[in-house]
From Swiss-Prot:
It comes from Chlorobium phaeobacteroides (strain BS1). Part of the 50S ribosomal subunit. The gene is rplP. GO terms for biological process: translation. The lineage of its organism: Bacteria, Pseudomonadati, Chlorobiota, Chlorobiia, Chlorobiales. Belongs to the universal ribosomal protein uL16 family. Keywords: Ribonucleoprotein, Ribosomal protein, RNA-binding, rRNA-binding, tRNA-binding. This is Large ribosomal subunit protein uL16.
Length: 139
C-alpha cells in the first residue's frame, strides 16, 4: 500500500479541487497512459487495486508507472461519536486528482494489451478516465 514514510503534519484540511491539473498532464515515461477526466480523491487501496489489475492482465510483461501518490491523510471519527471533541485520527491516504492528470503509464506491450489493461484498471477507480497514446506513436 502506498503512503508517505513520514509527514510534517499528521492531519490536513480537506481543501478544494478547483480547475484542471497543471502538472502531470503529459505522458513522460511510457507509450500509453490513463488520464483522469473528473476530480476525485483516489485512495491508496484504489491505486493498488488498479495496479494489480493491470499487472495481472499484462502477465508482468512491460513496465507500469504510477504517476500519482497518496500524500494526503483523511481523518475519521469513531462510529457513534458525538460531534466536537477535536478532529478524528488519520484513517487512510488519498491522492488529490484533478481532470487532465495522467495517473498510470505503461510501455513494452502491444496496443491492444495496453488498452484492455487500462480498461480493467479504470474499473477499479471512482472516476471517468480516458486511454491515451503518446502523440509520436499515433498514426
Amino acid at each position: 500500500m502506498l503512503m508517505p514514510k513520514r509527514v510534517k503534519y499528521r492531519k490536513v484540511q480537506r481543501g478544494r479541487m478547483k480547475g484542471d491539473a497543471q502538472r502531470g498532464t503529459t505522458i513522460s515515461f511510457g507509450s500509453y497512459g490513463l488520464k483522469a477526466l473528473e476530480p476525485a480523491w483516489i485512495t491508496n487501496r484504489q491505486i493498488e487495486a488498479a495496479r494489480i489489475a493491470m499487472n495481472r492482465y499484462m502477465k508482468r510483461d512491460g513496465k507500469i508507472w504510477i504517476r500519482i501518490f497518496p500524500d494526503k491523510p483523511v481523518t475519521k471519527k469513531a462510529a457513534e461519536t458525538r460531534m466536537g471533541s477535536g478532529k478524528g485520527s488519520p484513517e487512510f491516504w488519498v491522492s488529490v486528482v484533478k481532470p487532465g492528470r495522467i495517473m498510470f503509464e505503461a510501455d513494452g506491450v502491444p496496443l491492444d494489451v495496453a488498452t484492455e489493461a487500462f480498461r480493467l484498471a479504470a474499473k477499479k477507480l471512482p472516476i471517468k478516465t480516458k486511454f491515451i497514446v503518446r502523440p509520436d506513436l499515433e498514426g
